[in-house]
């Protein structure tokens, strides 16, 4: 009989087996209770740190600082001492002067009735900085669609230049005056003269499409495309022709007229490809 069989035979004939198992269970329960109690003890006194923790802490380069010395200093002195011990490379110098030793001013040239303006970025810019400089120039040129740059006022701020000017609005007064003069001439003519000329086929066709939606494509991240129609800007056919009697070349042109009529064109140009 091997050792396993002998052990089974012994346990089967052991009189105190039940008592031994009960003692083992009670011992296990006491151990678990003590473990749970230790988890909620807040003040356990000054217990020595296990050696494996000490070894791990001593290997960390961040703990090389003399902590005992810091406890003897006031809070302000601790901060000053800590800053003195920082590596020089970690200190940030905000007073570094930035100058461009080599810079070419803009040059305006005229050739055969055409003008050209050459703009030169400061020498030494990184690729990212050069792109930022270029986008700034493009933004200034883009703004000329909304106002007359030559009339803008340039204001110096602490960290920027501010351009201020009057927003350009669509001028339909010439068309209205032209129509009024035609109507006045017709009223002075003989009674047999025909009435006002009917609207062109194109104009009638555009208003017939007053409920047709046109998609404005977004050109900014985070801005969704927008669907608009003529009735979003004009309450009636009369209002449409009172804004610009000559009409528009196409439906998108009429939408643009509506945006200008509601003074929304400048905002739309910043967000959508118009």
From Swiss-Prot:
PTM annotation: Phosphorylated in the N-terminus by host CK2. Phosphorylation of the phosphoprotein is required for the transcriptional function of the P-L complex.
Modified residues (Phosphoserine): 59, 61, 236, 242
Compartments reported by the entry: Virion; Host cytoplasm
Region (Oligomerization): 104-165
Record site feature (Interaction with the Nucleoprotein-RNA), residues: 260
Compositional bias annotation for Acidic residues: 54-65
Composition bias, Low complexity: 174-193
Coiled-coil segments: none
Composition bias type Basic and acidic residues, residue spans: 27-36
Site (Involved in oligomerization): 133, 136
Alphabetical UniProt keywords: Chaperone, Host cytoplasm, Phosphoprotein, Viral RNA replication, Virion
Region listing for Hinge, in residue ranges: 166-202
Family: Belongs to the vesiculovirus protein P family.
Oligomer status and interactors: Homodimer. Interacts with the L polymerase; the association of P and L forms the polymerase complex and positions P optimally for encapsidation of newly synthesized genomes with the nucleoprotein. Interacts (via N-terminus) with N(0). Interacts (via C-terminus) with N in ribonucleocapsid (via C-terminus); this interaction allows to package the L polymerase in the virion and positions the polymerase on the template, since P acts as a bridge between N and L.
Domains (record comment): The N-terminus is disordered and is involved in binding N(0). The region of interaction with the L polymerase is necessary for transcription. The hinge region is highly variable. The central domain is involved in oligomerization. The C-terminus is basic and essential for binding the N-RNA template.
Function: Nonenzymatic cofactor regulating the function and conformation of the RNA polymerase and part of the transcription and replication complex. Binds the viral ribonucleocapsid and positions the L polymerase on the template. Acts as a chaperone for newly synthesized free N protein, so-called N(0). Plays a role in virion assembly.
Name of the protein this chain belongs to: Phosphoprotein
Species annotation: Vesicular stomatitis New Jersey virus (strain Missouri subtype Hazelhurst) (VSNJV)
Gene: P
